[in-house]
Amino acid sequence: MIQDRPPLILDFDGAVSDIPGAITLPLQAWQEKIRFGCRWAQFKQLETALQAQMPGDYGCVFTGSGDYHHLSQLLLNRLPTQQKFQLIICDNHPDNMRYPFGIHCGSWVYWASRLPQIEHVHVLGIGSQDIGLGHAWENHWSPLLKRKLTYWNINVDTRWMNWVGAGRSNRAFSHPDELMRAFLAQFDRSLPVYLSIDKDVLSPEVVNTNWDQGEFLEQHLNDLISACQGQIIGADVTGDVSAYHYESKFKRWLSASDGQEELPEAQVQIWQQQQNELNSRLVARINQGWRR
């Protein structure tokens, strides 16, 4: 019997715990630098530090709050460059926004789309107005125009993408069931998969996060993971919840402009328990899908 790869917790914020067999790296000292976003020099410093700390073999990586989704880029950089694969992201946001100060949790998909080993990037479950007309100019258009990136959205008016010539990189649906059926119907099961799940793609009926949330149910994630069985070469999960007060006024302003509020600690603890129960279920499913 092949042993499951041990889950790995990159513990910046204390949000993730109680995952059986997980390896935990304490990284709280990096929280102020890395959370929400950072300069490229800081990102590279963390990347170098983790090279000495991360185990040689690990399974699904948990990064804590969705404020750390840009760490997916760091994890992608660790994969062998000679192997082509598809990047499948579940997220209520495109994470393909312009950010001139380095990399942040809402811009990393653009940088991932530039990696030559990635055949295509799919972002499933977008319900955010980040891809609506009012924010069209904030999106990186180049990966959409090159057809390297596809948005799979639910109930967002994205007609502007047709106007700029990127209509074929957008799939619009009125219900998450329709979206998942359509995606799985065209899914290339012969190509390895890196799977990145931000739990803000889920309805608040499932779990709560500190970001605006989408309409997916847990079953939609289960269906996707099952379809990837035998092809997953890497996976990460973010979208857990934690309370943090930035020392940086700039980060406090950025966070507030994205609609984030500082949560009471009692509320955080209740939500974390629900999140950790879901995390354990996701790990069990992902462990069935590794490419051997």
Q: What is the meaning of each model-derived region?
A:
Residues 2-292:
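Conserved alpha-helical scaffold segments that buttress catalytic/binding sites
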